[in-house]
Curated annotation (Swiss-Prot):
Keywords from the UniProt entry: DNA-binding, Nucleus, Transcription, Transcription regulation
GO CC term (a single one): membrane
Pfam families hit by this protein: Ubiquitin_TPR1 (PF23603)
Species: Arabidopsis thaliana (Mouse-ear cress)
Name of the encoding gene: TRP1
Segments for region (Disordered): 440-467
Lineage: superkingdom: Eukaryota
Biological processes annotated in GO: ethylene-activated signaling pathway
Protein name stated in the entry: Telomere repeat-binding protein 1
Keyword Iron-sulfur: no
Subcellular location: Nucleus
Length: 578
């Protein structure tokens, strides 16, 4: 018997694979149902060659075929036609019309093959099967494929010890047409059996169907749910059934995959999102121009606040005092200072990237912000009334060396001229900054009733004296005139003589200003800074300074001489006493 597997693997053009051919194990291949075959008659096997030779010989020898038909008449298979004919779909045959002739093929049961070239019959001992024919009307299809228009009903085939079977035979069996007829199903069995033979029920598309049946049937039978049967419901087109499986399978696969990988995917997506977000934030500070840096300010560093409060005060009063002090700091025009890794950033025009502040920078925690006073002199904010604050300021003024403060007065001594020495009208630049702070403190806190008005004025005058103010030309001229008259060693007398009404001028200020004038007169005019002082006054300063210096030297010499004389007189008196 010819192996069914051999026929399936090495199929030929004149033989068709049975309808219950084995389907592939995997139905997950989503390829097209039909595939064109470039080479039609390549790799022809021995059985295919034998069938071709038999077909040609049977076509040429018509007389021998007629004799074979007569021999078959005695053992013709009984044909039973069912009462209800089932609709059959067209079967593709030869692409051209021709007379139907018996095509010799038989299934060998016992494995012994006797080749009769004329009738192409195989005999296997007592049991054999021969091929007959029946008539069909064939018309060509649009693309050349023949379609069966009038087909006979199902044929009951009985195989026994001496039975012979007739199957349709076509002239020129080995032509280039498509053979979709279902072949006989034979198996090795001791008992007789019968089975229906169904013509192939296939609806052809306008395009050419591949001729090699092996690959085509493999694709059509790709479904795992293939069931063979004789009912009409099972004869639906194979292509639609396969497409249904092709559509339903990805949905099932997707549902199964989502159900399995939900728990795993959620964690992975979350980690990926966080990772991408962090990398994006890191790279954007260097790439994008509109990137932002997120900072969190926990606290500010404020200047020191000196608060003194009696022990009998309440906690609420302490809180109010601290709040007043902080509000005073914020309302006095304080500015914000920035320190990066302990280094103060002074240039406000630098960008954050140039300073080293970026999103991926690890130094964001080392940023320090502080409130700094806008003025150079820090203001002393206390909870004391006005009198106590001024009493604390006064020792500070006395302890400070005003000589250092007034040392540079000669640079801008003539900036603000005035008509008289007693003129108290001063410009905005000459106003004391501490007096502004004192006025603010006085507006916020009321002075106690025990403090007199006179003490307040004295405290204000003491606070005003510690502020350096430039000398006008008139004040310089008055100072020179007083020094020429009284000398350089009598500064208290100079203050009472020339600056009695100027409360903001002390004898120390006058002494420092005189030293500055002497230094300015000794240097060249190119080295002088500020508004120049008239040269006449500078000459008078030099003359007065030289004169009084000489006088002081003479006075000192006289004093030394007196001391020497006294010592000599004492020594002589002592010697006389001895």
């Amino acid at each position: 018997m010819v192996s069914h597997k051999c026929v399936e693997e090495f199929g030929y053009a004149s033989y068709l694979v049975p309808s219950n051919a084995r389907a592939p194990r995997s139905a997950r291949k989503r390829r097209s149902i039909e595939k064109r075959i470039s080479k039609e008659d390549d790799n022809m096997c021995a059985i295919d060659l034998l069938a071709t030779v038999a077909g040609h010989l049977s076509f040429e020898s018509g007389s021998s075929l007629m004799s074979i038909d007569k021999l078959i008449e005695d053992h013709r298979v009984k044909e039973e036609f069912p009462e209800e004919e089932k609709p059959l779909m067209p079967v593709a045959l030869s692409p051209y019309r021709g007379s139907l002739s018996p095509c010799g093929f038989s299934s060998v049961i016992n494995g012994k093959v006797e080749n009769e070239v004329d009738g192409f019959s195989y005999s296997g001992g007592s049991d054999a099967c021969q091929v007959g024919n029946f008539s069909q009307d064939v018309k060509p299809d649009i693309d050349g494929d023949a379609v069966v228009l009038d087909a006979r009903p199902n044929v009951v085939v009985s195989l026994g010890s001496s039975s012979r079977t007739e199957v349709p035979s076509i002239g020129n069996c080995v032509s280039h047409g498509v053979r979709d007829d279902v072949n006989l199903f034979s198996r090795d069995d001791d008992e007789n059996f019968s089975k229906y033979i169904h013509p192939r029920v296939t609806k052809h598309s306008p395009r050419t169907v591949p001729r090699i049946g092996d690959r085509r049937i493999r694709k059509i039978l790709a479904s795992r749910h293939w069931k063979g049967g004789s009912r009409h419901s099972d004869t639906k087109p194979w292509r639609n059934y396969y497409l249904h499986q092709q559509r339903s399978y990805p949905i099932k696969k997707r549902k199964n995959f989502d159900h399995i990988s939900d728990s795993v995917t959620d964690d992975y997506r979350m980690r990926t999102k966080m990772h991408r977000g962090s990398r994006k934030g890191q790279g954007a500070s260097f790439v994008a121009s509109d990137s932002h840096v997120k900072l969190r300010i926990k606290s500010f560093r404020v200047p020191e606040l000196f608060i003194e409060i009696p022990e009998t005060a309440t906690v609420g009063s302490l809180k109010r005092m601290v709040m007043e002090a902080v509000s005073t700091l914020l309302s006095d025009g304080h500015r914000v200072g920035l320190m990066v890794q302990g280094k103060k950033v002074r240039d406000d025009n630098k960008t954050l990237h140039q300073t080293g502040i970026s999103q991926d920078n690890s130094h964001l925690d080392s940023l320090d912000f502080s409130l700094e006073p806008s003025s150079e002199m820090p203001q002393l904010l206390t909870s004391h009334p006005l009198g106590h604050a001024c009493e604390e300021l006064l020792p500070v003024c006395q302890a400070t060396k005003i000589d250092n403060v007034l040392e540079s007065d000669h640079h801008d001594s003539a900036l603000f001229p005035s008509d008289s020495l007693g003129n108290n009208n001063v410009t905005e630049d000459s106003k004391a900054m501490i007096s502004v702070a004192l006025n603010e403190l006085s507006s916020q806190s009321q002075p106690p009733s025990r403090k007199s008005r006179r003490s307040e004025q004295q405290q204000q005058q003491a606070a005003q004296r510690r502020i350096r103010r430039p000398f006008s030309v008139a004040e310089v001229e008055a100072l020179v005139q007083a020094v020429e008259k009284l000398g350089t060693g009598r500064w208290r007398d100079v203050k009472l003589c020339a600056f009695e009404d100027a409360d903001h001028r002390t004898y120390v200020d006058l002494k420092d200003k005189w030293k500055t004038l002497v230094h300015t007169a000794k240097i060249s005019p190119q080295q002088r800074r500020g508004e120049p002082v008239p040269q006449e006054l500078l000459n008078r300063v030099l003359n007065a300074h030289g004169y009084w210096t000489q006088q002081q030297m003479q006075q000192l010499q006289q004093n030394v001489n007196k001391l020497e004389q006294e010592t000599q007189s004492q020594t002589t008196e002592g010697l006389l006493l001895l």
